[in-house]
Amino acid sequence: MAKSIPSSGAGAVRIILKNKDAFHFDLREKKEDNGKQSYLFDVYYENTTGTLNVLMDNGEPVIAALNLSLGKVITLSNDTNLKKICNYVVDKVNA
C-alpha cells in the first residue's frame, strides 16, 4: 500500500512521484490551439481525488495546476516537481 497524502497536502507531488503505481488518471478533455495542447484529467491517489490541468507547448508544461480534494492547489510556481507529473501523465496518454 502506498503512502497516503497528509490532510494538509504537504509533499503531495513528491509522494505521488514515489508511488506512481498508486496514481491513476482519466483524460476528461483534450484541446489543441496554435500548436499548444490543453489537457484536463481526473486524478486519483490513495486517499484523495482531484483534477490536473496542463497546458503543453513544444512538449513542455507551461501552465499546470493539480487541484486536490484536500483543499490544496499545487501549481508549477509553488512546486517545480509538478512538471514531472505532467510529463508522466501526458506521455502515458499519448503513448
Where are these regions (language model features)?
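Low-complexity, intrinsically disordered/propeptide-like segments
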Residues: K20, D26-K30, L55-N58, S69-G71, ...
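Short, flexible helical or helix-coil boundary motifs
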Residues: K20, H24, T48, K92-V93
